[in-house]
Amino acid sequence: FHDIKILFTKKGTKIFKNLEVLKEKKFFKKIGISIYDTNCLNYINLNYNFDAVQCPYNILDKRIITTGWYDKLKNQGIETHVRSIFLQGLLVNKLLYKKNYFKKWKKLFINWFQSLENDNISPIDYCLSDLMNYDFDKIIIGINNSENLKEIINFKTVNKNKMINFNISDTKLIDPRSWK
């Protein structure tokens, strides 16, 4: 389910039950949901037996971890698939944060890119190294060009001592749906 709002309706319940029947008949192996924040998981987890959750995770947005849902899902045998590793490119492209919408966080991004430069660390290496702290089942990565792909394939793990603990709760920054 890409738009989970339907799961809060009678129609959604009916659709889910039909999907469970098809799953039992081996038409597919897993039923998954895609979320933007963890607030919906209490209701959905109580009312539906899904197999996978696709959610955002990056150095700024660790809500799946900080809310305890990562551990809960793991303990229930539910797969965690993470996306938005580079926050729609914002964490790896210096030009993006200069857009007017991100003015409020300009200092954060200047410090981010400057600290990486000072330590001779690529943003892609840093973001991917941060993922290594968890046992995510799948990682969905977007790229803009072949150089990005090469860097991802050849990424070098960043020393944990050089990792900064960001935890941003401002959804106007970490939820791309709010970007204008």
Regions found by a protein language model. Give the residues of each.
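Beta/alpha (TIM)-barrel catalytic core signal, keyed to glycine-rich beta->alpha loops juxtaposed to Asp/Glu
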Residues: 2-180
